[in-house]
Amino acid sequence: MVSPGLDLELSFSQAMQGFGLSPEVARLLWLPLPMLLVLVAAVVGVLVSVWLERKISAAVQQRVGPEYAGALGVLQPLADGLKLLVKEDIIPARADSILFTLGPILVVVPVIVSWLIIPFGQNLLISNVGVGIFLWIAFSSVQPIGLLMSGYASNNKYSLLGGLRAAAQSISYEIPLALAVLAIVMMSNSLSTVDIVNQQTGAGILSWNIWRQPVGFLIFWICALAECERLPFDLPEAEEELVAGYQTEYAGMKFALFYLAGYINLVLSAVLVSVLYLGGWGFPIPVEWLADWLHQPIDAPVVQVITGSVGIMMTILKAYLLVFIAILLRWTTPRVRIDQLLDLGWKFLLPLALVNLLVTAALKLAFPVAFGG
């Protein structure tokens, strides 16, 4: 657990100066680290998630799965990407070519931009803005426009139905998701993702928001799965009903963009759950214990470098545990009907999220120390 009063960037600089580097060189070495980490995490996250999807689905269906492209098939996602890259880019004769091309871009760009506010460590993020969570909700609201645009521009009835379903589903689940996040913001007194994690670093695992917001956690996770269009909520691209939904007429790299956006969004949602409810980079034990074991002061560079590195691994570990659960759900649960999907969002999750928000406000007034008063 990194103490909120300590600066990982400063500790890194001090550690580099201990090796004889000047402060300016240490600063230059630090600058690319947050951006590099985010880019690597997004790309590797997609590759690992696709590989996990293939292997877990094979295990559920008692198959071997990918095994020839690298050891245990780890290079299969790269092979899939190269295959889509070299395929012909086809635009249907009667499709609106401009909207047809713009649709996938509007779907994938907001997801990638959302990684700007994701913290992997105390200062390991690209943009620590004060309204980080608000920005993420705003970016995610752009996606339904791209999905509806893709379905409409394809000039295909299955694509149009898929686009309409995607837009309806996204709008239905964005509201309870935002209300669940608002309860966390209320307890943290901040919209910054860094502040939200720091608020969970008082007593190790017992400080995590999941214990104070179990209902909000379930609401957020269900809504996140619906936003990612994962089973049992993959109505927009239900193969048995709509061929491939809004993706029906797409091929090559345009289809790959939808594929990419889906998996980046899945990993992003898992990391956000880790940040909002599972303590983010926080380690389950207090940092003081590690400092005592190393016989170092709590603000020693070596202590902060170790806790920072472990914190990054903790964030990724928590996120991939949730990715594993999402993949397992896809291959073990049946798809719901569209009316059941909308009823769950509007008639159950939305009222439950409102009640959870009101209860959180009451608890904040009654127990200000425990609930961030």
From Swiss-Prot:
Principal location listed in the UniProt entry: membrane
Subcellular localization, as worded in the UniProt entry: Cellular thylakoid membrane
Principal EC category: translocase
A GO term from the CC aspect: plasma membrane-derived thylakoid membrane
Domain of life, source organism: Bacteria
Topological category with respect to the lipid bilayer: Multi-pass membrane protein
Pfam family, one: NADHdh
Catalytic activity, EC: 7.1.1.-
Keyword match NAD: yes
Annotated keywords: Membrane, NAD, NADP, Plastoquinone, Quinone, Thylakoid, Translocase, Transmembrane, Transmembrane helix
GO biological process: aerobic respiration; photosynthesis, light reaction
Coiled coil: none
Catalytic activity annotation: a plastoquinone + NADH + (n+1) H(+)(in) = a plastoquinol + NAD(+) + n H(+)(out); a plastoquinone + NADPH + (n+1) H(+)(in) = a plastoquinol + NADP(+) + n H(+)(out)
InterPro entries noted in UniProt: NADH_UbQ_OxRdtase_su1/FPO, NADH_UbQ_OxRdtase_su1_CS
Keyword DNA-binding: no
An example Gene Ontology molecular-function term: NADH dehydrogenase activity
Transmembrane residue ranges: 28-48, 98-118, 129-149, 167-187, 205-225, 267-287, 309-329, 348-368
HAMAP family (UniProt xref): NDH1_NuoH
Family statement drawn from the similarity comment of this UniProt entry: Belongs to the complex I subunit 1 family.
Subunit structure: NDH-1 is composed of at least 11 different subunits.
Described purpose of this protein according to its UniProt entry: NDH-1 shuttles electrons from an unknown electron donor, via FMN and iron-sulfur (Fe-S) centers, to quinones in the respiratory and/or the photosynthetic chain. The immediate electron acceptor for the enzyme in this species is believed to be plastoquinone. Couples the redox reaction to proton translocation, and thus conserves the redox energy in a proton gradient.
Alphabetical list of NCBIfam families matching this protein: PRK06076.1-2, PRK06076.1-5
Protein name: NAD(P)H-quinone oxidoreductase subunit 1
Organism in which the protein naturally occurs: Synechococcus sp. (strain CC9902)
